[in-house]
Amino acid sequence: VGNADQDHAEWCAPEDQSDASRQVYQTSNGASDIAAEYAAALAVNYINFGNAEDLSYAKALYEFSIKYNKTAEDGIGEFYRSYDYYDDQAWAAGWLYLATKDNTYKTFLNTFMNASNQGKSGSSGCQWGVYSPMSWNNVSLGSAILQGEITGNASDWSKVTTYLNQKCNSESTYYCEDSWGSCRYNAAMQMAALATSK
């Protein structure tokens, strides 16, 4: 939703922008990445608040995501594209497993994560298992954290802790993944480290 060029040109609340019109996109056969992200969010909401409708929609969105296996990359503008959907589907599967204890979701999460560590490539040629800070484009680190929490296997946790130690093991420098939005990446890495250490 929105126009990134317009949004970046004005530094104010969206409702105060001079032209507050918003573009909205819809699909009936794609956007697996976005559908899975919403499925994950609704599953978390169900875990926190117990609203059965949230869980019902989370399951439906997850099924939609699995059915079409396409990213929303085409047609939504040039900003904040997600170049794959497997990481989002694994993220949703992890949260749906925690919400339902249905092993179907656990199996998908484990299948994705095991494939990612064997160098599976997605439709865009991205290398799975190469973690990065949580962002609109990649939530595989979060999926790996969920896998470690769900399985409790030391080998699953070691993948996460090895990555975090390689990136964040410095007391004298500011971690900077990318110069554009460096604080958000730093905060995302801190969140991942906190979630891993709990």
Sequence positions of predicted segments:
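Glycan-recognition and catalytic cores of secretory/periplasmic carbohydrate-active enzymes
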Residues: 1-198
